C-alpha cells in the first residue's frame, strides 16, 4: 500500500500546530488588502489575525482569491515526487473555486504520474467545520485506513459536519451579498443577530435570529443540543472573529450543558473573516444531519 498525504487549504482554519500534528499539508488562499496581497497561512506569518480584524474594524476593505490550478499542480507535484498519493480535501465548492482548481490540477497530473492516486473531496464545509472534517479524516488515516477507505469515510461523513454561527455586525454580510441593505439596517437597529448554518450543498444559509448577542451565542448551543450525536464523546471545534471571550463562553456552555470534554478554539481566518466580520462566532460538531 502506498503512503498518502492529506492536502487541504487554509479555509480549514486549523491552528498551524494542529495541522502539523495531524500531518496534513495546507495550501493558502490569498487576501488583497490595501496595496498588498497576503497569503492566508495558518500561522498568520504574512498578516496576523488580530491585525486583520483591527484593520477591518477601521473600515479597510479586502478581496479574496481561491487557490488556483497552478498552485495546486506545484504542491501536488512536490508530494507525488516523494512517491506518495494525495487525498485533497477542499473548501466548499459553493463558496469558492478552490475545489474546482484541485480537480483540474489532479487531472492535469495523471499522465505525468500514471501510477499515483490523486483523490479529491469537496468538503462542503467552511472554517473550522472544514478543519473538523480534515481532523476526522486524519484520525482515520492514523488508524491505518487506506486512501480509498478514507475517501469513502469522507464522503459518508461530510453531510453530518454541522456548522452553526452568528455574526455581530450584519453589514459585513450585506457587503458580501448574503442579506439585503434593509435587513442589515433594521437588524442593526433592533440588535437582531442572525443564526446561520452551512447546508447540505455547502451554502451559507440564514435559518433564524436572536435578540442580542448572548441570545445568539446560546442559540448555537441549542442547535448542537438538538442534533449532536454523542456530544460528550466527540471533539468540538469553535472559531471566532477576534472575540475569544465569546468563544470561551460557548465552550463553557457545551461543556456544562452537553458534557463535552474536548474543545478546540481558533480564529476565523482572514479569508472567511473578510465576509463575516469581527465578532463572528461559529460552533462545529458531528450531528445526525446538518
Give the residues covered by each predicted segment.
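N-terminal glycine-rich anion-binding loop in soluble enzyme alpha/beta folds
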Residues: 5-66, 71
Amino acid at each position: 500500500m502506498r503512503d498518502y498525504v492529506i492536502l487541504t487549504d487554509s479555509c480549514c482554519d486549523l491552528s498551524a500546530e494542529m495541522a502539523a500534528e495531524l500531518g496534513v499539508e495546507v495550501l493558502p488562499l490569498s487576501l488583497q488588502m490595501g496595496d498588498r496581497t497576503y497569503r492566508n497561512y495558518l500561522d498568520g506569518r504574512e498578516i496576523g489575525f488580530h491585525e486583520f480584524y483591527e484593520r477591518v474594524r477601521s473600515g479597510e476593505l479586502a478581496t479574496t482569491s481561491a487557490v488556483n490550478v497552478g498552485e495546486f499542480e506545484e504542491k501536488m507535484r512536490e508530494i507525488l515526487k516523494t512517491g506518495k498519493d494525495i487525498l485533497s480535501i477542499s473548501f466548499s465548492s459553493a463558496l469558492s473555486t478552490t475545489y474546482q482548481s484541485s480537480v483540474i490540477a489532479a487531472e492535469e497530473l495523471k499522465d505525468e504520474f500514471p501510477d499515483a492516486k490523486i483523490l479529491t473531496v469537496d468538503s462542503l464545509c467552511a472554517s473550522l467545520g472544514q478543519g473538523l472534517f480534515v481532523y476526522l479524516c486524519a484520525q482515520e488515516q492514523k488508524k491505518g485506513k487506506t486512501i480509498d477507505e478514507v475517501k469513502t469515510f469522507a464522503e459518508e461523513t461530510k453531510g453530518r459536519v454541522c456548522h452553526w454561527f452568528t455574526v455581530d455586525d450584519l453589514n459585513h454580510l450585506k457587503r458580501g451579498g448574503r442579506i439585503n441593505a434593509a435587513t442589515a439596517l433594521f437588524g442593526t437597529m433592533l440588535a437582531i443577530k442572525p443564526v446561520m448554518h452551512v447546508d447540505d450543498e455547502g451554502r451559507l444559509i440564514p435559518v433564524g435570529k436572536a435578540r442580542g448577542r448572548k441570545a445568539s451565542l446560546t442559540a448555537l448551543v441549542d442547535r448542537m443540543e438538538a442534533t449532536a450525536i454523542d456530544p460528550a464523546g466527540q471533539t468540538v471545534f469553535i472559531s471566532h472573529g477576534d472575540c475569544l471571550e465569546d468563544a470561551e463562553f460557548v465552550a463553557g456552555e457545551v461543556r456544562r450543558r452537553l458534557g463535552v470534554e474536548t474543545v478546540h478554539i481558533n480564529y476565523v481566518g482572514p479569508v472567511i473573516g473578510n465576509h463575516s466580520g469581527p465578532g463572528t462566532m461559529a460552533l462545529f460538531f458531528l450531528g445526525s444531519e446538518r
